[in-house]
Amino acid sequence: MASDRQNLQDAFLNHVRKTKVPVTIFLINGVKLQGVITWFDNFCVLLRRDGQSQLVYKHAISTIMPAQPISLYEGEDSN
């Protein structure tokens, strides 16, 4: 069933959250944030760095770049 399949955004965010991979988040105004994603929902991401948490609204995010390569769908086509 197609609705059982997780969307790419949720799969990506869940993977970096579970594995605690550090990320760099670029906002649409050019600001660069770095840290570990500890939580997310449909509207925002919680980013933690040096014991501080930042609530970042998804509509302000341009790009999320993990600090290391990640593999989301092992064994599947790269399509």
Swiss-Prot record:
Q: Does the keyword RNA-binding apply?
A: yes
- Coiled coil located at which positions? none
- From the UniProt record, give one GO term of the biological process aspect: regulation of RNA stability
The domain of life for this entry's organism is: Bacteria
One GO MF term: RNA binding
Q: Where is the Sm domain?
A: 10-70
Q: Cellular component per GO?
A: cytosol
The cross-references to InterPro entries, in alphabetical order and at most eight, read: Hfq, LSM_dom_sf, Sm
CDD domains for the chain:
Hfq
Leader sequence residues: none
What keywords does the record list, in alphabetical order?
Answer: RNA-binding, Stress response
Family indicated by similarity: Belongs to the Hfq family.
Q: What does this protein do?
A: RNA chaperone that binds small regulatory RNA (sRNAs) and mRNAs to facilitate mRNA translational regulation in response to envelope stress, environmental stress and changes in metabolite concentrations. Also binds with high specificity to tRNAs.
Q: Subunit comment for this entry? A: Homohexamer.
Q: What is this protein called?
A: RNA-binding protein Hfq
Protein species of origin = Ruegeria sp. (strain TM1040) (Silicibacter sp.)
The organism's lineage is: Bacteria, Pseudomonadati, Pseudomonadota, Alphaproteobacteria, Rhodobacterales
